[in-house]
Amino acid sequence: MHFLSEDLEDYVAAHSQAEPELLAQLNKETYQKVLLPRMLSGHFQGRVLSMLSKLIRPSSILEIGTYTGYATLCLCEGMQENGIVHTIDIKEELVDFQRKYFDKSPWSNQITQHLGDALEIIPTLNKKYDLVFIDADKENYINYFEMIVPKMNKGGIILSDNVLWSGKVLEPLQKNDLSTKILLEYNQLLNNDPRVETVLLPIRDGLTVSRVL
């Protein structure tokens, strides 16, 4: 869900940095060939991710939920020259699609793809991170956060996507709606956890920026 009108979204995009050509191609092919293309970050949120990365200047990035690799490439734009990205996704059918676009980018040799369950993969990554982007199964957001915090460098940034969940965070909770229940708990955790300071941005479907203290 987007919380701005279509006209306002168009205005915002028109007055933000243009979408790079490679990402425009990736965007188009995702909508043509991949299921659930609305999961793609898209032009405006992609530019936000790029800007945040450029402000942070990370040398190490972890992404949980690659999808077709759009956000991955946005985050790479601010990465230090010798930086690395580890990106995790569970969908085998997307691996070649991701790699095709990674190989067209300047960061082909700096992006490591991991296929499988992030809860199993994260503990095997012996690395400290400057920037983490969580955009995977909502039921595990809290589990991901708890795994990630000890792996963060001081001052590192954790980005969490879809935290407004199409506005469901304000609606009466349905009995079997585990995703919304966990997101409500997650948003509360980020707001109260003394290990981080957090701001929730109403960008697209909600994007939280948490700085590790």
Where are these regions (language model features)?
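N-terminal auxiliary segments of SAM/dcSAM-dependent transferases
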Residues: 1-20, 34-35
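Short N-terminal amphipathic alpha-helix/helix-capping patch enriched in small hydrophobics
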Residues: 8, 22, 45-48
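Generic alpha-helical segment signature
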Residues: 19-23, 179
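Beta-strand-loop-alpha "switch" segments that mediate conformational coupling across diverse proteins
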Residues: 26
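Short, contiguous, well-ordered secondary-structure segments
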Residues: 35-36, 59
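N-terminal small-domain helix-loop-helix segment of the aminotransferase-like
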Residues: 38-40
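S-adenosylmethionine/decaboxylated-SAM
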Residues: 43-213
